[in-house]
Protein backbone atom coordinates (compact mmCIF):
# COMPACT_ATOMS: atom_id res chain seq x y z
CA UNK A 1 0.00 0.00 0.00
CA UNK A 2 1.17 3.52 -0.79
CA UNK A 3 2.02 6.00 1.94
CA UNK A 4 3.26 9.58 2.17
CA UNK A 5 5.10 11.73 4.69
CA UNK A 6 4.61 15.50 4.87
CA UNK A 7 6.47 18.07 6.97
CA UNK A 8 5.24 21.48 8.05
CA UNK A 9 7.71 23.19 5.70
CA UNK A 10 5.99 21.59 2.70
CA UNK A 11 8.37 18.65 2.25
CA UNK A 12 6.43 15.72 0.77
CA UNK A 13 7.78 12.20 0.28
CA UNK A 14 6.09 9.08 -1.03
CA UNK A 15 6.83 5.55 0.13
CA UNK A 16 5.26 2.25 1.15
CA UNK A 17 3.05 1.72 4.17
CA UNK A 18 3.53 -0.82 6.93
CA UNK A 19 1.96 -1.23 10.34
CA UNK A 20 -1.49 0.22 10.95
CA UNK A 21 -3.48 1.29 7.88
CA UNK A 22 -4.17 4.80 9.17
CA UNK A 23 -2.45 8.17 9.27
CA UNK A 24 -0.38 9.64 12.09
CA UNK A 25 0.60 13.05 13.44
CA UNK A 26 3.55 14.12 15.55
CA UNK A 27 6.86 15.94 15.73
CA UNK A 28 9.41 14.07 13.61
CA UNK A 29 12.76 13.32 15.25
CA UNK A 30 15.70 11.19 14.15
CA UNK A 31 17.38 8.48 16.21
CA UNK A 32 21.01 7.57 15.48
CA UNK A 33 21.00 4.12 17.11
CA UNK A 34 21.88 1.27 14.74
CA UNK A 35 19.97 -1.27 16.86
CA UNK A 36 17.50 -1.05 19.74
CA UNK A 37 14.47 -0.13 17.66
CA UNK A 38 12.16 -2.21 19.88
CA UNK A 39 13.25 -0.32 22.99
CA UNK A 40 12.88 3.00 21.14
CA UNK A 41 9.40 2.20 19.82
CA UNK A 42 8.20 1.30 23.33
CA UNK A 43 9.95 4.16 25.15
CA UNK A 44 7.28 6.46 26.70
CA UNK A 45 9.59 9.44 26.11
CA UNK A 46 8.75 9.22 22.38
CA UNK A 47 5.04 9.85 22.97
CA UNK A 48 3.81 12.59 20.64
CA UNK A 49 6.64 12.02 18.15
CA UNK A 50 7.13 10.33 14.80
CA UNK A 51 10.36 8.37 15.09
CA UNK A 52 12.77 8.14 12.15
CA UNK A 53 15.79 5.83 12.25
CA UNK A 54 18.97 7.04 10.52
CA UNK A 55 20.33 3.50 10.08
CA UNK A 56 19.06 2.40 6.64
CA UNK A 57 17.88 -1.16 7.36
CA UNK A 58 15.58 -1.78 10.33
CA UNK A 59 13.89 -4.92 11.63
CA UNK A 60 16.55 -7.55 10.87
CA UNK A 61 16.32 -9.28 14.25
CA UNK A 62 12.58 -8.94 14.70
CA UNK A 63 10.76 -8.11 17.93
CA UNK A 64 10.93 -9.68 21.38
CA UNK A 65 8.63 -8.58 24.21
CA UNK A 66 11.45 -8.93 26.72
CA UNK A 67 12.94 -5.82 25.11
CA UNK A 68 9.83 -3.68 25.69
CA UNK A 69 10.37 -0.55 27.81
CA UNK A 70 6.64 -0.16 28.55
CA UNK A 71 3.32 -1.87 27.91
CA UNK A 72 3.38 -1.17 24.16
CA UNK A 73 4.42 1.05 21.26
CA UNK A 74 4.39 4.74 22.23
CA UNK A 75 5.52 6.54 19.05
CA UNK A 76 2.94 8.20 16.80
CA UNK A 77 4.56 6.86 13.63
CA UNK A 78 7.70 5.09 12.38
CA UNK A 79 9.86 6.13 9.41
CA UNK A 80 12.61 3.93 7.94
CA UNK A 81 14.61 3.71 4.73
CA UNK A 82 14.08 -0.04 4.37
CA UNK A 83 12.10 -2.45 6.55
CA UNK A 84 13.19 -6.07 6.86
CA UNK A 85 10.19 -8.25 6.03
CA UNK A 86 11.72 -11.57 7.13
CA UNK A 87 13.60 -11.10 10.43
CA UNK A 88 15.96 -13.83 11.57
CA UNK A 89 16.84 -14.25 15.24
CA UNK A 90 16.21 -17.02 17.75
CA UNK A 91 14.56 -14.52 20.13
CA UNK A 92 12.22 -13.01 17.55
CA UNK A 93 8.49 -13.32 18.22
CA UNK A 94 7.18 -11.09 15.42
CA UNK A 95 8.21 -8.56 12.79
CA UNK A 96 8.17 -4.77 13.17
CA UNK A 97 5.24 -4.66 10.75
CA UNK A 98 3.27 -7.05 12.97
CA UNK A 99 4.21 -5.09 16.09
CA UNK A 100 2.95 -1.80 14.68
CA UNK A 101 -0.26 -3.42 13.44
CA UNK A 102 -0.86 -4.84 16.91
CA UNK A 103 -0.56 -1.41 18.54
CA UNK A 104 -2.28 0.53 15.73
CA UNK A 105 0.73 2.66 14.79
CA UNK A 106 1.46 3.62 11.15
CA UNK A 107 4.82 3.30 9.45
CA UNK A 108 6.36 4.34 6.15
CA UNK A 109 9.42 2.95 4.35
CA UNK A 110 11.22 3.81 1.12
CA UNK A 111 11.77 7.50 1.90
CA UNK A 112 15.11 9.32 1.88
CA UNK A 113 15.90 9.27 5.60
CA UNK A 114 19.38 10.71 4.99
CA UNK A 115 17.93 13.82 3.37
CA UNK A 116 15.31 14.15 6.12
CA UNK A 117 17.95 13.82 8.84
CA UNK A 118 20.05 16.57 7.25
CA UNK A 119 16.98 18.79 6.92
CA UNK A 120 16.04 18.34 10.59
CA UNK A 121 19.65 18.88 11.63
CA UNK A 122 19.78 22.18 9.72
CA UNK A 123 16.27 23.55 10.31
CA UNK A 124 15.25 21.76 13.52
CA UNK A 125 12.51 19.31 14.45
CA UNK A 126 9.23 19.81 12.58
CA UNK A 127 5.63 18.79 12.83
CA UNK A 128 4.87 15.95 10.43
CA UNK A 129 2.03 13.80 9.14
CA UNK A 130 1.87 10.29 7.70
CA UNK A 131 -0.86 9.50 5.17
CA UNK A 132 -1.88 6.05 3.93
CA UNK A 133 -3.31 5.12 0.51
CA UNK A 134 -4.22 7.75 -2.08
CA UNK A 135 -3.10 10.91 -0.31
CA UNK A 136 -3.90 14.51 -1.18
CA UNK A 137 -0.57 16.33 -0.91
CA UNK A 138 -1.94 19.72 0.12
CA UNK A 139 -4.25 18.22 2.74
CA UNK A 140 -1.46 16.16 4.29
CA UNK A 141 0.85 19.17 4.52
CA UNK A 142 -2.01 21.13 6.08
CA UNK A 143 -2.51 18.38 8.67
CA UNK A 144 1.16 18.60 9.57
CA UNK A 145 0.98 22.38 9.93
CA UNK A 146 -2.29 22.59 11.85
CA UNK A 147 -1.55 20.01 14.56
CA UNK A 148 -0.55 21.45 17.96
CA UNK A 149 3.09 21.91 18.91
CA UNK A 150 4.50 19.26 21.22
CA UNK A 151 4.99 21.99 23.85
CA UNK A 152 1.22 22.52 23.90
CA UNK A 153 0.29 18.90 24.69
CA UNK A 154 0.14 17.24 28.11
CA UNK A 155 1.94 14.02 27.21
CA UNK A 156 3.01 12.75 30.63
CA UNK A 157 -0.58 12.07 31.67
CA UNK A 158 -0.91 9.74 28.66
CA UNK A 159 1.97 7.44 29.65
CA UNK A 160 2.17 7.34 33.46
CA UNK A 161 0.56 4.85 35.84
CA UNK A 162 -2.87 5.83 37.13
CA UNK A 163 -2.46 4.28 40.58
CA UNK A 164 0.44 3.17 42.78
CA UNK A 165 2.29 0.05 41.68
CA UNK A 166 4.70 -2.06 43.75
CA UNK A 167 7.99 -3.74 42.74
CA UNK A 168 9.81 -5.87 45.33
CA UNK A 169 13.54 -6.63 45.39
CA UNK A 170 15.61 -8.72 47.81
CA UNK A 171 16.90 -5.58 49.54
CA UNK A 172 15.74 -3.26 52.31
CA UNK A 173 15.78 0.19 50.68
CA UNK A 174 12.42 1.85 50.00
CA UNK A 175 12.08 4.34 47.15
CA UNK A 176 9.08 6.17 45.73
CA UNK A 177 9.45 6.46 41.96
CA UNK A 178 7.42 9.32 40.49
CA UNK A 179 6.32 8.02 37.08
CA UNK A 180 6.39 10.58 34.27
CA UNK A 181 6.82 7.81 31.68
CA UNK A 182 9.36 5.49 33.26
CA UNK A 183 11.26 2.90 31.22
CA UNK A 184 11.32 -0.64 32.57
CA UNK A 185 15.12 -0.66 32.31
CA UNK A 186 15.23 1.96 35.09
CA UNK A 187 13.01 -0.18 37.29
CA UNK A 188 15.20 -3.23 36.63
CA UNK A 189 18.44 -1.39 37.46
CA UNK A 190 17.06 -0.22 40.80
CA UNK A 191 15.66 -3.64 41.68
CA UNK A 192 19.06 -5.22 40.95
CA UNK A 193 20.56 -2.96 43.61
CA UNK A 194 18.17 -4.02 46.36
CA UNK A 195 15.70 -1.17 46.03
CA UNK A 196 12.00 -1.81 46.64
CA UNK A 197 9.92 0.52 44.48
CA UNK A 198 6.53 2.10 44.89
CA UNK A 199 5.73 3.65 41.52
CA UNK A 200 3.25 6.52 41.78
CA UNK A 201 1.61 8.84 39.20
CA UNK A 202 3.29 12.12 38.26
CA UNK A 203 0.65 14.10 40.19
CA UNK A 204 0.96 12.09 43.42
CA UNK A 205 1.00 14.64 46.31
CA UNK A 206 4.23 15.32 48.19
CA UNK A 207 2.41 14.98 51.50
CA UNK A 208 1.44 11.38 50.73
CA UNK A 209 5.02 10.57 49.74
CA UNK A 210 6.21 11.94 53.10
CA UNK A 211 3.69 9.71 54.89
CA UNK A 212 5.26 6.68 53.20
CA UNK A 213 8.60 7.58 54.84
CA UNK A 214 10.79 6.33 51.96
CA UNK A 215 14.58 6.24 51.95
CA UNK A 216 14.54 8.16 48.70
CA UNK A 217 12.55 9.60 45.81
CA UNK A 218 13.30 9.01 42.13
CA UNK A 219 11.89 11.19 39.32
CA UNK A 220 11.64 9.30 36.03
CA UNK A 221 12.07 10.13 32.38
CA UNK A 222 9.09 11.07 30.23
CA UNK A 223 7.88 12.92 27.13
CA UNK A 224 7.22 16.54 26.26
CA UNK A 225 7.90 19.97 27.68
CA UNK A 226 8.92 19.83 31.37
CA UNK A 227 7.27 23.20 32.03
CA UNK A 228 3.85 21.55 31.55
CA UNK A 229 4.40 18.96 34.29
CA UNK A 230 3.53 21.34 37.11
CA UNK A 231 2.33 18.75 39.69
CA UNK A 232 5.70 16.98 39.65
CA UNK A 233 7.57 20.29 39.80
CA UNK A 234 5.61 21.18 42.93
CA UNK A 235 6.27 17.76 44.47
CA UNK A 236 10.02 18.13 43.91
CA UNK A 237 9.97 21.64 45.35
CA UNK A 238 8.32 20.38 48.55
CA UNK A 239 10.51 17.30 49.01
CA UNK A 240 13.97 18.51 47.93
CA UNK A 241 16.26 18.69 50.94
CA UNK A 242 13.97 16.51 53.06
CA UNK A 243 14.37 13.17 51.25
CA UNK A 244 17.35 12.04 49.11
CA UNK A 245 16.37 12.47 45.48
CA UNK A 246 17.50 11.59 41.96
CA UNK A 247 16.17 12.37 38.50
CA UNK A 248 16.74 11.06 34.99
CA UNK A 249 16.05 12.89 31.70
CA UNK A 250 12.69 14.65 32.20
CA UNK A 251 13.22 14.15 35.95
CA UNK A 252 16.50 16.07 35.63
CA UNK A 253 14.74 18.96 33.87
CA UNK A 254 11.83 19.00 36.34
CA UNK A 255 14.25 19.15 39.26
CA UNK A 256 16.01 22.14 37.72
CA UNK A 257 12.69 23.93 37.16
CA UNK A 258 11.51 23.18 40.70
CA UNK A 259 14.61 24.72 42.23
CA UNK A 260 14.80 27.91 40.20
CA UNK A 261 16.37 27.17 36.81
CA UNK A 262 14.82 27.32 33.34
CA UNK A 263 14.73 24.90 30.41
CA UNK A 264 14.74 25.43 26.65
CA UNK A 265 13.87 23.41 23.55
CA UNK A 266 16.79 21.96 21.62
CA UNK A 267 16.97 22.48 17.86
CA UNK A 268 16.54 18.78 17.07
CA UNK A 269 17.00 17.02 20.40
CA UNK A 270 19.27 14.18 21.40
CA UNK A 271 17.99 10.77 20.28
CA UNK A 272 20.33 7.81 20.10
CA UNK A 273 22.83 5.68 21.98
CA UNK A 274 26.06 7.41 20.96
CA UNK A 275 26.09 10.77 22.78
CA UNK A 276 29.47 11.66 24.41
CA UNK A 277 29.32 12.95 27.99
CA UNK A 278 32.30 14.34 29.94
CA UNK A 279 32.47 13.89 33.70
CA UNK A 280 34.33 16.77 35.37
CA UNK A 281 35.26 14.87 38.54
CA UNK A 282 37.12 12.07 36.76
CA UNK A 283 37.87 13.71 33.42
CA UNK A 284 36.48 10.62 31.71
CA UNK A 285 34.20 10.61 28.68
CA UNK A 286 31.23 8.25 28.61
CA UNK A 287 29.10 7.23 25.65
CA UNK A 288 25.47 7.57 26.68
CA UNK A 289 21.96 6.80 25.51
CA UNK A 290 19.70 9.86 25.23
CA UNK A 291 16.16 10.75 24.24
CA UNK A 292 15.05 14.31 24.96
CA UNK A 293 14.02 17.52 23.20
CA UNK A 294 14.58 19.96 26.07
CA UNK A 295 17.62 20.88 28.17
CA UNK A 296 18.49 22.84 31.31
CA UNK A 297 19.65 26.42 30.75
CA UNK A 298 23.06 26.59 32.46
CA UNK A 299 22.91 30.37 32.85
CA UNK A 300 19.80 30.14 35.03
CA UNK A 301 21.03 27.46 37.45
CA UNK A 302 21.10 28.67 41.07
CA UNK A 303 24.55 28.80 42.66
CA UNK A 304 23.57 25.88 44.93
CA UNK A 305 23.84 23.55 41.91
CA UNK A 306 27.09 22.17 40.57
CA UNK A 307 27.22 20.99 36.95
CA UNK A 308 29.08 17.67 37.03
CA UNK A 309 28.79 16.54 33.41
CA UNK A 310 28.31 18.10 29.97
CA UNK A 311 27.50 16.91 26.46
CA UNK A 312 30.58 17.18 24.26
CA UNK A 313 28.53 17.76 21.10
CA UNK A 314 26.69 20.91 22.20
CA UNK A 315 27.91 21.51 25.80
CA UNK A 316 24.44 21.19 27.33
CA UNK A 317 24.09 20.11 30.96
CA UNK A 318 24.21 16.33 31.43
CA UNK A 319 24.64 16.02 35.19
CA UNK A 320 24.02 18.08 38.34
CA UNK A 321 24.35 17.76 42.10
CA UNK A 322 23.05 20.02 44.83
CA UNK A 323 25.74 21.41 47.13
CA UNK A 324 23.59 21.56 50.27
CA UNK A 325 21.52 18.36 50.31
CA UNK A 326 21.39 14.88 48.70
CA UNK A 327 20.13 15.41 45.16
CA UNK A 328 21.67 14.10 41.93
CA UNK A 329 20.33 14.23 38.38
CA UNK A 330 21.43 13.28 34.87
CA UNK A 331 20.02 14.23 31.48
CA UNK A 332 21.06 11.02 29.72
CA UNK A 333 19.70 7.50 30.31
CA UNK A 334 22.17 5.63 32.55
CA UNK A 335 20.06 2.48 32.27
CA UNK A 336 20.69 2.47 28.49
CA UNK A 337 17.93 0.28 27.05
CA UNK A 338 19.23 0.41 24.36
CA UNK A 339 22.80 1.61 24.51
CA UNK A 340 26.18 1.27 26.21
CA UNK A 341 26.50 0.38 29.88
CA UNK A 342 29.10 3.09 30.61
CA UNK A 343 26.85 4.98 33.02
CA UNK A 344 25.31 2.22 35.17
CA UNK A 345 27.36 3.73 38.01
CA UNK A 346 24.71 6.44 38.42
CA UNK A 347 22.44 3.91 40.11
CA UNK A 348 25.28 2.83 42.40
CA UNK A 349 25.82 6.46 43.41
CA UNK A 350 22.13 6.86 44.14
CA UNK A 351 22.01 3.73 46.31
CA UNK A 352 25.17 4.80 48.16
CA UNK A 353 23.55 8.18 48.79
CA UNK A 354 20.41 6.53 50.17
CA UNK A 355 22.42 4.44 52.62
CA UNK A 356 24.54 7.41 53.69
CA UNK A 357 21.52 9.54 54.57
CA UNK A 358 19.33 6.73 55.89
UniProtKB/Swiss-Prot annotation:
The keyword Iron-sulfur does not apply. One of its GO terms (biological process) is glutamine metabolic process. The keyword Nucleotidyltransferase does not apply. Pathway: Amino-acid biosynthesis; L-arginine biosynthesis; carbamoyl phosphate from bicarbonate: step 1/1; Pyrimidine metabolism; UMP biosynthesis via de novo pathway; (S)-dihydroorotate from bicarbonate: step 1/3. The active site is at residues 249, 333, 335. GO terms for molecular function: ATP binding; carbamoyl-phosphate synthase (glutamine-hydrolyzing) activity; glutaminase activity. L-glutamine binds at residues 45, 222, 224, 250, 253, 291, 294. It comes from the Archaea. It holds the Pfam family CPSase_sm_chain. Residues 174-358 form the Glutamine amidotransferase type-1 domain. It catalyses: hydrogencarbonate + L-glutamine + 2 ATP + H2O = carbamoyl phosphate + L-glutamate + 2 ADP + phosphate + 2 H(+). Keywords: Amino-acid biosynthesis, Arginine biosynthesis, ATP-binding, Glutamine amidotransferase, Ligase, Nucleotide-binding, Pyrimidine biosynthesis. It is an enzyme of class 6 (ligase). Small subunit of the glutamine-dependent carbamoyl phosphate synthetase (CPSase). CPSase catalyzes the formation of carbamoyl phosphate from the ammonia moiety of glutamine, carbonate, and phosphate donated by ATP, constituting the first step of 2 biosynthetic pathways, one leading to arginine and/or urea and the other to pyrimidine nucleotides. The small subunit (glutamine amidotransferase) binds and cleaves glutamine to supply the large subunit with the substrate ammonia. HAMAP family: CPSase_S_chain. Composed of two chains; the small (or glutamine) chain promotes the hydrolysis of glutamine to ammonia, which is used by the large (or ammonia) chain to synthesize carbamoyl phosphate. Tetramer of heterodimers (alpha,beta)4. NCBIfam families: CPSaseIIsmall (TIGR01368), PRK12838.1 (NF009475). This is Carbamoyl phosphate synthase small chain.
